[in-house]
Amino acid sequence: MGKVLIVIDMQNDFVTGTLGNKEAQAIVLNVQAKVKEYADRGDWIIFTRDTHEKNYLDTPEGKKLPAKHCINGTEGWQIVPELEVENCEYVDKPTFGWLNWEGFESNDEIELVGVYTDICVVSNALILKAKYPEAIISVDVSCCAGVTPEKQAAALETMKSCQIDVYRQEQ
C-alpha cells in the first residue's frame, strides 16, 4: 500500500493573484507542513496545475469565469514557492478535474489538499474514487480552501456522501 499526496492547484493566481482569497492564503503553511510530512517519508507527491492558454477568455470556461488566470508559463501559473519540493510530479490539467489519473493501486491511500475545495478538489476526489473505488481517498480540511466558506462546506458534505474521508489534522 502506497501513500500519495495530490496538491490541487496551489498556484500563485489562486493564492495571491487574480483569483486568490484570504482562505487560500491561510492554508499555505498547513499545506507546506503536509508536503514536508510526505516528502520526509519519501511518499509520492503530485502537484496539479490549472493550465490555460492565452485564448482562455474565448473558451467556454473563460466565458463563464472571465478572469484570466493560470496562463501557461506565467508567474500566476507557478506553484506557490513555499510548497516546491524535489522528487515530485506535476499534472497540467486544462479543466477542473483530471481524467487521466494513472499509476495508483486499489489499496493506495490518496490524500488531496489545495484549492478550491468546491471546484477542483471535489472534482478530482470524485474522479479518483470512481476510478479507484477500493482506494482510501481523503481530504484534510485544514489544507483546503473554498471559493467561499459556504461553498467549501457544501463540497465537503458532497465528498462525505461519496465515501471520501474528510478530516481535519490538528496543526
Regions found by a protein language model. Give the residues of each.
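Glycine-enriched alpha-helix->loop->beta-strand junction motifs that scaffold or abut catalytic
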Residues: 112, 132-134
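Phosphate/ribose-phosphate-bearing ligand recognition and processing surfaces
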Residues: 114-123, 138-149
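Active-site beta-loop-alpha junctions enriched in small/polar residues
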Residues: 50, 96, 142-144
